[in-house]
Amino acid sequence: MGRSKSSSRWLNEHHSDVYVKKSKEDGFRSRASYKLIELDRQDKLLRPGMTVIDLGAAPGGWSQVVADVVGDQGKVVACDLLSMDSIAGVTFFQGDFTEDEMLDAILNEVNSRPVDLVISDMAPNMSGMKSVDIPKAMYLVELALDLACRVLKKNGCFVAKVFQGEGFDQILQESRGRFSSVNIRKPDASRARSREIYLVAKGFRG
């Protein structure tokens, strides 16, 4: 069975992608690492000793960046539906974040430790139908924001992949009510044709 036009286009883009090549050279597991590196450079999100929760972590590009910065005194708790090879300094749970069991596992691992940053690169399996995909994606953002508001320390930060469409304005308004600063970013490492953007919320009001 031949490849579809869309899958062939993705493969061509992937092989010619400067960030894919750079990730291999720098030892990162995915090009997504550079999205977080750029967001951190712009918004100063990471520092040594932080406690960070990474949602939608596999294959581990963001967790690698975070673990490298927070160091031995920090703590990184990650989860994903997909499996992920271990990363030094990262506690990983494989499972469905929309299920209470996974939420409980994350909360137990954090164990009342104040969380400095919640990051989410979660996205649903895309069908190509915006009317289906966008609500699913924004539901994941809503769950991630709920967790952030539950565990973040005062002045903590939240970063999430979002998609413009149904539910976006509501998430933006909700975030602005809970954080002192909310910005929308489109990192250079995000593919130009991708609808993904990143919500960066700083200064959790508690």
UniProtKB/Swiss-Prot annotation:
Its main location: cytoplasm. It holds the Pfam family FtsJ. Keywords: Cytoplasm, Methyltransferase, rRNA processing, S-adenosyl-L-methionine, Transferase. GO terms for cellular component: cytoplasm. It is found in: Cytoplasm. Gene3D superfamilies: Vaccinia Virus protein VP39. InterPro entries: RNA_methyltr_RlmE, RNA_MeTrfase_FtsJ_dom, rRNA-MeTfrase_E, SAM-dependent_MTases_sf. Coiled coil: none annotated. GO terms for molecular function: rRNA (uridine-2'-O-)-methyltransferase activity. It is an enzyme of class 2 (transferase). It comes from the Bacteria. Its EC number is 2.1.1.166. It catalyses: uridine(2552) in 23S rRNA + S-adenosyl-L-methionine = 2'-O-methyluridine(2552) in 23S rRNA + S-adenosyl-L-homocysteine + H(+). The active site is at residue 161. Transmembrane segments: none annotated. PANTHER family: RIBOSOMAL RNA METHYLTRANSFERASE (PTHR10920), RRNA METHYLTRANSFERASE 2, MITOCHONDRIAL (PTHR10920:SF18). Belongs to the class I-like SAM-binding methyltransferase superfamily. RNA methyltransferase RlmE family. Specifically methylates the uridine in position 2552 of 23S rRNA at the 2'-O position of the ribose in the fully assembled 50S ribosomal subunit. This is Ribosomal RNA large subunit methyltransferase E. It comes from Hahella chejuensis (strain KCTC 2396). The gene is rlmE.
